[in-house]
Regions:
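All-alpha prenyltransferase/terpene-synthase fold signal
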Residues: 1-229
Length: 229
């Protein structure tokens, strides 16, 4: 965020092809080096990311997403990428299954915290690299809004759902949703959940010996949850 993406520079067709090329290159490198475990890790990540995106598309259409659904989506579509990167690196360096699983879980917790932080930007200022209320306009129900829909009055819930379904392009209506989420404590709730995943990630790191690598990973977790954009 803050830099031009491949899509911004070359639009959809080129960006999809670049992504396919990089994926194919990574899979081929694993095969050439007979890193079959790494190949399995990467292939599983692609499967999970696809499943996460498909589930999000379905739930955006039906608007019946639960908190459990939300975590299934972000665990698959976002966290699995970082989890697989950590697992692949761990196995390549150690061939230790227990160590690989521990770092995979570290990556997953960090990835979940990253996505919650990203979702919180939708309710903040407009200078973070994505428009405020963009998730609402795209009918994406994220953790702050899911919490609000679960805890608010039936009347307010009906109004919020109506706006998301029918008036999600109207600026004042989107702002009403944002205000209701803030009023209901949805932001605070999401921040607390994010902090719990951050702590889980850092606790896993503490089980490793002190090193520059551990410090760098710790700084990454902190950056993930405290970034401004």
């Amino acid at each position: 965020r803050g830099f031009f993406s491949v899509y911004a520079l070359w639009k959809n067709k080129a960006s999809v092809l670049v992504g396919d090329y990089l994926l194919a290159k990574g899979l081929l490198l694993s095969l050439e080096n007979k890193d079959f475990k790494v190949l399995e890790i990467l292939s599983d990540a692609v499967k999970k990311m696809s499943e996460g995106e498909l589930l999000q598309l379905e739930k955006s259409r039906l608007l019946n997403i639960t908190e459990e659904d939300y975590f299934s989506i972000i665990r698959n579509k976002t966290a699995s990428l970082l989890a697989s990167a950590c697992a692949a690196g761990a196995f390549s360096a150690s061939q230790d299954d227990a160590l690989t699983e521990k770092l995979r879980l570290f990556g997953e917790n960090t990835g979940i915290a990253f996505q919650i932080k990203d979702d919180l930007f939708d309710y903040g200022s407009a200078d973070v690299g994505k428009p405020t209320g963009n998730d609402i306009r795209e009918k994406k129900l994220t953790l702050p809004l899911i919490y609000t829909l679960k805890t608010t009055s039936a009347e307010t819930r009906r109004k919020l759902i109506y706006i998301i379904k029918n008036k999600n392009k109207d600026k004042s209506s989107v702002q009403f949703v944002i205000d209701e989420v803030k009023k209901a404590g949805g932001i605070q709730y999401a921040e607390e959940v994010m902090a719990s995943y951050k702590k889980a990630a850092l606790d896993l790191l503490e089980s490793f010996p002190a090193s520059e690598a551990r410090d760098a990973l710790s700084e990454m977790v902190t950056f993930t949850t405290e970034r401004k954009k």
